[in-house]
Amino acid sequence: MISNVLKRASVLARSNGIQSAFYTTTAKTEASSSPQMKIKTAEKKDHFVNFQVYRYNEETTAKPYIQTYNINLKDCGPMVLDALLLIKNNIDPTLSFRRSCREGICGSCAMNLNGSNTLACTKKITDCLSGDTVKVYPLPHMHVVRDLIPDLSHFYTQHKSIKPWLEPAVDVPRYNGKEILQSKENRHKLDGLYECILCACCSTSCPSYWWSEGGDGGYLGPAVLLQAYRWIADSRDSIQKDRLAILSEDQMKVYKCHTIMNCTAVCPKGLNPGKSIANIKYLLAHN
């Protein structure tokens, strides 16, 4: 019955000189494909920018140096990572840096751009220009493997020390193919925590972390402490006391935070590690 009604409506529309949506769409498509109907797009203008890039290779040079590349923004995409890829692919294949997702998810391309830590894949070139120059450095106060690649080994060791995984209660079946459920309220407590991508922008912008001693002790830094609180706050976890005990073994792991808040200022995901550290301090004082 419905199909008959549609057919009658179509016949009536044509008899009244009204085109159906199909014919209208077809006509528009044919018109747009016509050479006379093509829309002219504005051509990109030349815009040259100097990229001053930190270079270091312990195999070929004893000291780091700055190398300048003159790039026409007309030839690359809008992000700093686009310019670095242009340099590597077309100008200097020896330039080394990390990159992967190109959409602010993996954290691989974290670096220091004009004095501020951020992700090269989400930072527009025009947003970090100083005159006609962009200064590109590796994350500060880290050993440099090569060029823009920092050594994050110690950072990952610290992250491992907080047991960054879920430890459910013993009586919760682990391998029955079902989720460990939690209420909406408890799930909401993880907002602003689980989004951390461990890019290390916050930790390497923190003076307290710069002054921290290496090895197993010392200040854990904002990124690792935010991750620590992420698991402490998870209602599905059963070892909150153990996690707090790990953090209280050495007071400097947490209390070396002096609320400078560089961490919150530079986080490319808009998170607040300083708040997480304050919450940990509160729990340590009341447990």
Swiss-Prot record:
It catalyses: a quinone + succinate = fumarate + a quinol. A ubiquinone binds at W211. Transmembrane segments: none annotated. Its EC number is 1.3.5.1. Pfam families: Fer2_3 (PF13085), Fer4_8 (PF13183). Keywords: 2Fe-2S, 3Fe-4S, 4Fe-4S, Electron transport, Iron, Iron-sulfur, Membrane, Metal-binding, Mitochondrion, Mitochondrion inner membrane, Oxidoreductase, Transit peptide, Transport, Tricarboxylic acid cycle. [4Fe-4S] cluster binds at C196, C199, C202, C267. Its main location: mitochondrion. [3Fe-4S] cluster binds at C206, C257, C263. GO terms for molecular function: 2 iron, 2 sulfur cluster binding; 3 iron, 4 sulfur cluster binding; 4 iron, 4 sulfur cluster binding; electron transfer activity; metal ion binding; succinate dehydrogenase (quinone) activity; ubiquinone binding. Residues 186-216 form the 4Fe-4S ferredoxin-type domain. It is a peripheral membrane protein. [2Fe-2S] cluster binds at C101, C106, C109, C121. It is found in: Mitochondrion inner membrane. Binds 1 [2Fe-2S] cluster. It comes from the Eukaryota. Belongs to the succinate dehydrogenase/fumarate reductase iron-sulfur protein family. Iron-sulfur protein (IP) subunit of succinate dehydrogenase (SDH) that is involved in complex II of the mitochondrial electron transport chain and is responsible for transferring electrons from succinate to ubiquinone (coenzyme Q). Component of complex II composed of four subunits: the flavoprotein (FP) SDHA, iron-sulfur protein (IP) SDHB, and a cytochrome b composed of a large and a small subunit. This is Succinate dehydrogenase [ubiquinone] iron-sulfur subunit, mitochondrial. It comes from Dictyostelium discoideum.
